[in-house]
């Protein structure tokens, strides 16, 4: 019986070796098979694993299991993934920056590699309490939209201030878009408080007071024409104390030239400037009419015969008729009387005419002192009136008369 037991034990050891080498699954290791004799084979299998393996058995160590293979595969995938996740380099394109006539200016611009997927990933990583607003409603976009609205409002307000042609010019920013800035020319008003004081001082002059009181229809001196006088004072560049009565009428005459251009109303300026001598100014366009009435009727009759006498000059010299020679001798007398009549005119009338000529010359010099800029914009006139809106001069409005 002892021999048979030893034989069965040896056979069980051999069969245990074969089963453990061919079935390396961990479930078999945890539940070792029992031999036919009923004894466990766990200790025998552990002792045999350390020795040389039988033929046909895989000699790979237990660390080369499926878990190791999966680890190697995962490491290989992790090495390949960074190559796929690298952000593509931004591409470069050429875009049109400016088109002027037939010339086109190009500039190089990079294309942004940011996609909507990146915004979605960013929003998914935000905290639960943060509002994942869409990318086009970000803070930068909102600030840009607010800035653009403010720039459009400023653009609507600025052109109203730019219309006035004023002496000095400066450059101001009209629009700022990104890194581009558009400049425009703007004139600065030179109307100072000194010019308003000089104008108010001249209003106290008795002649100017009488003139403004006479112009009840406001044909020559309404509020806009008087505001142009202040604008001309500022453009002429004279000191405030140097402006006198003549400068007031010069500026007013020039303002009527620009706006009204009514000769009859402008002649009234001479009437008040040179007192009542305007009625005595000679009418040089009708000198022959005055001379004809002042001549002797016989002389006027002989004067009508002058062309006939000139044609028959040769006959007159030979003619013995004394009446014809007597009429010819009166022709120089008519010329002398015409010269005497011209000198017998009122000396004040001739003086007033010379004053009118001098007035026109001074008006031209005053116009040149303003750099030949006589046009005044409505915006500048309103600005001048806004300096002292309660002044009695600004109540001279033609709209109130109708």
UniProtKB/Swiss-Prot annotation:
The gene is SPDYE2. Residues 76-89 have a biased composition (Acidic residues). Pfam families: Spy1 (PF11357). Residues 1-89 are annotated as: Disordered. This is Speedy protein E2. Belongs to the Speedy/Ringo family. GO terms for molecular function: protein kinase binding. InterPro entries: Speedy (IPR020984). The lineage of its organism: Eukaryota, Metazoa, Chordata, Craniata, Vertebrata. Residues 16-39 have a biased composition (Polar residues).
């Amino acid at each position: 019986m002892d021999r048979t037991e030893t034989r069965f034990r040896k056979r069980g050891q051999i069969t245990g070796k074969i089963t453990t080498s061919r079935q390396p699954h961990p479930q078999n290791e945890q539940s070792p098979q029992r031999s036919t004799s009923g004894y466990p084979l766990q200790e025998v299998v552990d002792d045999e694993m350390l020795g040389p393996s039988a033929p046909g058995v895989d000699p790979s160590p237990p660390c080369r299991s499926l878990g190791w293979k999966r680890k190697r595969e995962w490491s290989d995938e992790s090495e390949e993934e960074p190559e796929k996740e690298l952000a593509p380099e931004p591409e470069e394109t050429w875009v049109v920056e400016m088109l002027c006539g037939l010339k086109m200016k190009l500039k190089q611009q990079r294309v942004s590699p940011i996609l909507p997927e990146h915004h979605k990933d960013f929003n998914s990583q935000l905290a639960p309490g943060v509002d994942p607003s869409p990318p086009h409603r970000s803070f930068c976009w909102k600030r840009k939209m607010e800035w653009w609205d403010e720039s459009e409002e400023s653009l609507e307000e600025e052109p109203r201030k730019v219309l006035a042609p004023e002496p000095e010019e400066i450059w101001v920013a009209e629009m700022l878009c990104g890194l581009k800035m558009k400049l425009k020319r703007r004139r600065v008003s030179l109307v100072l408080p000194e010019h308003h004081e000089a104008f108010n001082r001249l209003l106290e002059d008795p002649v100017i007071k009488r003139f403004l009181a006479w112009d009840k229809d406001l044909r020559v001196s309404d509020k806009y024409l008087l505001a142009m006088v202040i604008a001309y004072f500022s453009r002429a560049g004279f000191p405030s104390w140097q402006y006198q009565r003549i400068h007031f009428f010069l500026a007013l005459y020039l303002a009527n030239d620009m706006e009204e251009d009514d000769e009859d109303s402008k002649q009234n300026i001479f009437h008040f400037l040179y007192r009542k001598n305007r009625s005595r100014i000679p009418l040089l366009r009708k000198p022959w009419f005055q001379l004809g009435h002042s001549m002797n009727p016989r002389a006027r009759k002989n004067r009508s015969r002058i062309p006939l006498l000139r044609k028959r000059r040769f006959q007159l010299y030979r003619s013995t008729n004394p009446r014809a020679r007597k009429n010819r001798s009166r022709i120089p007398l008519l010329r002398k009387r015409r010269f005497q009549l011209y000198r017998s005119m009122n000396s004040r009338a001739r003086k007033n005419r010379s004053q009118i000529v001098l007035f026109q010359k001074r008006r031209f010099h005053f116009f040149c002192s303003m750099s030949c800029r006589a046009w005044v914009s409505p915006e500048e006139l309103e600005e001048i009136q806004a300096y002292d809106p309660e002044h009695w001069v600004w109540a001279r409005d033609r709209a109130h008369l109708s």
